[in-house]
Amino acid sequence: MKSYEFDIASNLRIQHSIETIKILKKYFKNEVFIRGNCDQAPFSLACSIRTPAFFMMDLMMEEEKAIRLIEYTTDMCARVVRIMAEAGADMVSNGDSPAGPNMISPDMYKRFAFPYERRMLEEAHLQGVPYLLHICGNTDRILQSLATMNLDAVELDYKTPLENICKFLGNRMTLFGTVDPSGVMALGTTDDVRRETQKILDIYYGNPRLVIGAGCAIPPIA
């Protein structure tokens, strides 16, 4: 498989992110906490390059080539982490939703996603910033794996039982979430938002490792 080298920092969207972080940092200084969203983690980026259907087949039939692609995307993702940190982000994050149990088994997650997510965490720490990992869907079957990664923060979906998140991750890392972004934030009422927020507060009562928000991207109609 041929690898292609290019200057990620010259990408227009990356340039917009860099400039936005710099403007916010200059204006607010340390008054606000800036999360630099580096978007896709290595497994997810490889999935996007090949398309989900083809990449799932690659994992089963062309494992060596699939791993080479993930190694390549790991390098690309690490560069974005460095760029965001150098721009002034207080924290960086990646999303790896295709690596969740809704798409692949927990065993496949441990082989093809977990090691590369951990390398993103290590890269962030080398840059002196905390790291957040986002995974959509029901992550119940990989919570114990996540607990061993020493993440600073995790952003999980409403589909994962909050009691289990608190049990396995509550004393290890900060939780961002887990309000339903569509059913509650976009289509629900203010009472629905208040009720779901209170449920989260009740379960995490006494635990400061919580930042309440949507567990995934909020639709623009919200």
Describe these PLM feature segments.
Residues K2-A222:
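Active-site loop segments of alpha/beta catalytic cores
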